[in-house]
Amino acid sequence: MSPCKLLPFCVALALTGCSLAPDYQRPAMPVPQQFSLSQNGLVNAADNYQNAGWRTFFVDNQVKTLISEALVNNRDLRMAALKVQEARAQYRLTDADRYPQLNGEGSGSWSGNLKGDSATTREFSTGLNASFDLDFFGRLKNMSEAERQNYLATEEAQRAVHILLVSNVAQSYFNQQLAYAQLQIAEETLRNYQQSYAFVEKQLLTGSSNVLALEQARGVIESTRSDIAKRQGELAQANNALQLLLGSYGKLPQAQTVNSDSLQSVKLPAGLPSQILLQRPDIMEAEHALMAANANIGAARAAFFPSISLTSGISTASSDLSSLFNASSGMWNFIPKIEIPIFNAGRNQANLDIAEIRQQQSVVNYEQKIQNAFKEVADALALRQSLNDQISAQQRYLASLQITLQRARTLYQHGAVSYLEVLDAERSLFATRQTLLDLNYARQVNEISLYTALGGGWQQ
């Protein structure tokens, strides 16, 4: 049988060669089968949870605009996309080793002696060379599969960066709006303190108050000015953080009215299975890494067996270009080669041990990812009801403080209480308003965290 007829048969045989990689089995989830949920924000148990696109989840148009801008300009996302391209090219490079390689060559030479008393000798040659490794034991196949899984892992890593960016931009925007609101409250409180100071000063002139009350009024004014300076610094830092995420330094949003309607509530079925975590890109990335490690075991096992390569070529040579392709000037060759590992001081066994250990590490990493994801969802669910209860209590407390302050001012005007009573009521009201803002912001961030922990933020 000629080499040309033998080569296709060898190619087909090698491409369908066996694989020594262990059969892949997804590790069991090391977490409970279901989440323990309260009744807040749940839908019917028969309904299935589906992640809404971020354009649906975020109702605030300003948030949508900022996220769209960040997805275009953010450098972290660009870097993730470039890593995907690199991994895709690496996979193509490794996979190319599984197929025959064909190369052409041509050359010409001229020679003669320096005296010039003899004719110049000319020699021309051309040829084709083919080489192919017979992958009977799946070494190249498993190496290619490992690179394919690495490529798929980088795609999931890009999705994770995308989701994290959507979450961070939204949280950064709400943090900026919180800084605006805190600054506004501090400025309003300063104006109220200044009015109180003017009133106390007037009473001092009429003898209805004393210098101590006036100094107390001046003290809270200066304290509030200090708080305003602090809030201005926080606002500047929030703006800087938002610009970094956006990847541009254009005009930033000004103070907006932000409330609970700025995003949708994540509604979950009462029997939410933990299996839903498997759609998270970081967990899918870890699983692809595990599958790559599994394939590397197959490649390491194949190193214990013989490797066979085939080399074949045809060539012609002539001193005249016109007769270069004459049949009489051509020749062919076929060179099969086999390499059998005999002694390598335990190198192959060490490589196999490394591959198996790395596969075990990948299993641990996969399980850790699932446990961390379960904790993130469980924490967000636990915090959701707690924040709602805290906000309700703070709202009632705020209403009570407003009444207390009004009555304290009335009693002070009639001389029934000292200015210290008014001052305490004003301070409590100021602190409670700021606390309520912090709680509302925390509720928004927690809802975004729950949405992200469940894998939301990839689709529009």
UniProtKB/Swiss-Prot annotation:
Its main location: membrane. Forms pores that allow passive diffusion of cations across the outer membrane. Part of a cation efflux system that mediates resistance to copper and silver. PROSITE patterns: PROKAR_LIPOPROTEIN (PS51257). GO terms for biological process: monoatomic ion transport; protein homotrimerization. It is found in: Cell outer membrane. Keywords: Cell outer membrane, Ion transport, Lipoprotein, Membrane, Palmitate, Porin, Signal, Transmembrane, Transmembrane beta strand, Transport. A lipid is attached at residue 18 (N-palmitoyl cysteine). Belongs to the outer membrane factor (OMF) (TC 1.B.17) family. NCBIfam families: outer_NodT, PRK09837.1. It is a multi-pass membrane protein; Lipid-anchor. It comes from the Bacteria. GO terms for cellular component: cell outer membrane; pore complex. One of its GO terms (molecular function) is efflux transmembrane transporter activity. Residues 1-17 form the signal peptide. This is Cation efflux system protein CusC. A lipid is attached at residue 18 (S-diacylglycerol cysteine). Homotrimer. Component of the cus efflux system composed of CusA, CusB, CusC and CusF. Induction: Transcriptionally regulated by CusR in response to copper and silver ions.
